[in-house]
């Protein structure tokens, strides 16, 4: 950080300006980034409603005072730590605390704090900070955030060691029901105790996400784990605690969720596949060979084998989110798929009728699946 200089002075010294919104400069030799000290003033609602002052009169303390949390409001000069807001103490005590009431001027900071909490999962968000985050949630400012901006923070959170903390913090400050009402709706939704001793659908979802994060760093897996049971929130009350058909009813919820936050196609497609087919995988030992073939085809596994890998990680995570025991279904479905990958279909290619060729290939595949042992 550079204090006491202007953009013109930086350029005259040979620095190259690269920042569009903020004056950030590249050192002419080392290519290190240098930013001018700045302060901002709230001018309008939302994350972008600020004017900025980058003048040479801005002091370091003024710049740090406008930072979001104390552990981000420290600087170092000549090996001397400058810490006007006791960030070192909060770092030592593992506390995430806002610097000042200016925190509430930027609604994006609610998501940032939740993300920091999931990244540094042994840190605690200070109760005063939760309180001010709740004020932001109640102010209507969160609604000003674009779907793309929310997704950027959510995606970063999903790559942290424990993304479930991100959503728990948002729940605690009232932001979950505003930004992610589909997830918030899972709270208090009962499940059949025999299959879900862990509790309601929200508790189950967070546990599935935790297990998915232990098994994979893939964002496709983690997002699918988060959204796979959205349909349970709209199960008709008369059939609770059962959730017959929730996999189908959840598809439109996921479609809308993905559209709102501009999900990449790869993430959205995997979320939809896991939602639609996860129950079939759980009961794969009860399925006919033809239904297993239809499942593999529905996953588009023959063209994209990775789809099956991602799917099985998700279904195993779903299982571990309710019962902490083995999941042989994944191994069995993998064996079924392996039996088909190098299957000799020359008998079918001798036929002339395209429809009969297709029927013969299906018949050969079903016979191969039937030969796969179901004992584990």
Regions found by a protein language model. Name each.
Residues 1-376:
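Catalytic cores of the polymerase beta-like nucleotidyltransferase superfamily
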């Amino acid at each position: 950080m550079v204090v006491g200089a202007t953009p013109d002075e930086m350029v005259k010294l040979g620095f190259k300006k690269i920042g569009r919104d903020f004056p950030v400069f590249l050192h002419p030799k080392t290519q290190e980034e240098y930013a001018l000290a700045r302060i901002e003033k709230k001018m309008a609602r939302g994350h972008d409603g600020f004017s900025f002052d980058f003048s040479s009169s801005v002091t370091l303390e003024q710049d740090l005072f406008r930072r979001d949390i104390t552990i981000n409001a420290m600087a170092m000069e000549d090996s001397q730590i400058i810490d006007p807001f006791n960030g070192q103490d909060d770092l030592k005590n593992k506390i995430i605390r806002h610097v000042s009431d200016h925190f509430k001027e930027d609604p994006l900071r609610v998501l940032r704090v939740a993300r920091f909490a999931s990244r540094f999962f042994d840190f605690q968000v200070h109760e005063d900070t939760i309180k001010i985050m709740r004020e932001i949630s109640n102010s209507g400012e969160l609604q000003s955030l674009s779907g793309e901006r929310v997704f950027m923070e959510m995606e970063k959170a999903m790559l942290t060691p424990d993304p479930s903390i991100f959503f728990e913090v948002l729940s605690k400050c009232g932001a979950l029901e505003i930004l992610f009402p589909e997830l918030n709706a899972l709270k208090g939704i009962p499940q059949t105790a025999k299959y879900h001793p862990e509790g309601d659908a929200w508790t189950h979802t967070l546990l599935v996400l935790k297990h998915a994060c232990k098994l994979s760093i893939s964002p496709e897996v983690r997002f699918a784990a988060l959204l796979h049971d959205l349909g349970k929130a709209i199960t008709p009350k008369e059939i609770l605690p059962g959730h017959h058909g929730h996999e189908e009813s959840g598809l439109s919820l996921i479609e809308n969720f993905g559209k709102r936050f501009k999900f990449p196609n790869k993430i959205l497609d995997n979320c939809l596949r896991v939602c639609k087919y996860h129950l079939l995988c759980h009961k794969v030992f009860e399925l006919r060979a033809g239904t297993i073939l239809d499942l593999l085809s529905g996953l588009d596994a023959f063209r994209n084998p990775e789809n099956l890998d991602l799917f099985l990680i998700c279904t195993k995570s779903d299982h571990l989110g309710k019962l902490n025991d083995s999941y042989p279904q994944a191994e069995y479905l993998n064996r079924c798929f392996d039996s088909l990958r190098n299957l000799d279909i020359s008998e079918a290619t001798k036929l002339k009728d395209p429809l009969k060729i297709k029927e013969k290939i299906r018949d050969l595949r079903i016979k191969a699946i039937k030969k796969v042992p179901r004992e584990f």
